[in-house]
Regions:
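Residue-level detector of flexible, active-site-proximal loop/helix-junction positions
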Residues: 63, 98-100, 173, 216
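Serine-esterase "nucleophile elbow" of acetyl-processing enzymes
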Residues: 33-97, 113-120
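Acidic/histidine-rich helix-loop elements
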Residues: 65-73, 93-110, 136, 140-144, ...
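Alpha-helical cap/lid subdomain in secreted, periplasmic
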Residues: 17-18, 110-248
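N-terminal Sec-pathway targeting helices
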Residues: 5-25
C-alpha cells in the first residue's frame, strides 16, 4: 500500500513538473512574440488626438506596453488610464518590449521608430518608465552612466514646446518565476540603484515621481511571470498614475 502511494506521488510530481515546464515555454514564447510583433510595428494602435484634447504619452518598455496583460490592448495601463481620464484626453501607448533607456544597451528605445512617433505626438503630458531591462548585467554600466543616458532621453521630451507635465516612474519589483527572475533582470538592482537613480532624475528635472516599487511591493499575485503585471496589476498602475495626474 505504501509502495503504491509513493508511486502515485512520484507520478503526480512528474505531471506537475511537465505542466510547469510547459507554462514556462508558453511564457517565453509569448514574450518573444511581443518582441518581434512590436518590431514589425503591428502592436501599437496609436490614436489621433482631437482638437483641444490633452495629449498623454506613456513611454516605456514591456510593462508599459502590456506584455501578458489579458485583454490587451484595452486592459494595458495606458488604455485604462485613458478611460479613467475620459473625454478631453487622448492617451497613447508608446511602450516597447525589451527596450532600455541607455542608448548603448543591446535594445535601446531611442533606436526605434516608435520613439520618434512618441516625440512627434507632441504630448502635453509624458509618463516615462525604464530600468527593468537596463538592470541586466549585460547592459548595466553603473548608476552614473544610467542617469546620464536616461537624462538625454528625458531631455528629448522636455525639449518639445508642447509639454506641460512629465512623470517618471520607478519600475516595480521583479520576483522569481519558477525558481528564478526571468529575462536576466537584476531584481536587487531594480530595488536599489534603479530606484535611487529614478528619484535623482525626478529631482534633477523637477518631474513628478511615482514609485511603483513601493506601490507593488508585496503584491506578487499581480504579476503574471514575476515581471509583467496582470490585467489587475495594470489597473492598479493606471489608478496610481491617474491619482498623480489629478493631484497636479
Amino acid at each position: 500500500m505504501n509502495g503504491e502511494t509513493a508511486k502515485k506521488r512520484t507520478s503526480a510530481k512528474r505531471v506537475i513538473g511537465v505542466v510547469l515546464a510547459f507554462l514556462i515555454v508558453i511564457a517565453e514564447c509569448g514574450l518573444l512574440m511581443a518582441y518581434y510583433m512590436g518590431e514589425l510595428g503591428q502592436l501599437h494602435p496609436l490614436k489621433e488626438a482631437k482638437d483641444g484634447d490633452v495629449k498623454v504619452a506613456c513611454v516605456g518598455d514591456s510593462i508599459t506596453f502590456g506584455t501578458f496583460v489579458f485583454g490587451w490592448p484595452e486592459a494595458a495601463y495606458p488604455s485604462v488610464l485613458g478611460n479613467m481620464l475620459g473625454k478631453g484626453y487622448t492617451v497613447n501607448n508608446y511602450g516597447y518590449p525589451g527596450r532600455c533607456a541607455q542608448s548603448d544597451a543591446d535594445r535601446p528605445y531611442v533606436k526605434e521608430e516608435l520613439y520618434q512617433k512618441a516625440l512627434d505626438f507632441n504630448a502635453d503630458v509624458v509618463i516615462i518608465m525604464f530600468g527593468s531591462n537596463d538592470s541586466k548585467n549585460a547592459d548595466w554600466k553603473g548608476e552614473e552612466h544610467f542617469i546620464a543616458e536616461y537624462s538625454a532621453l528625458i531631455e528629448s521630451f522636455l525639449a518639445r514646446p508642447s509639454i506641460k507635465e512629465m512623470y517618471i516612474m520607478a519600475p516595480p519589483p521583479a520576483w522569481e518565476f519558477f525558481g528564478k527572475v526571468r529575462y536576466n533582470i537584476n531584481s536587487d538592482r531594480v530595488k536599489n540603484e534603479i530606484n535611487r537613480a529614478t528619484r535623482t532624475l525626478a529631482d534633477k528635472y523637477d518631474l513628478g515621481f511615482i514609485d511603483l516599487y513601493e506601490v507593488f511591493d508585496g503584491k506578487r499575485e499581480l504579476f503574471a511571470d514575476g515581471v509583467h503585471p496582470t490585467d489587475k496589476g495594470a489597473k492598479l498602475l493606471a489608478e496610481t498614475v491617474y491619482s498623480a495626474i489629478r493631484r497636479k
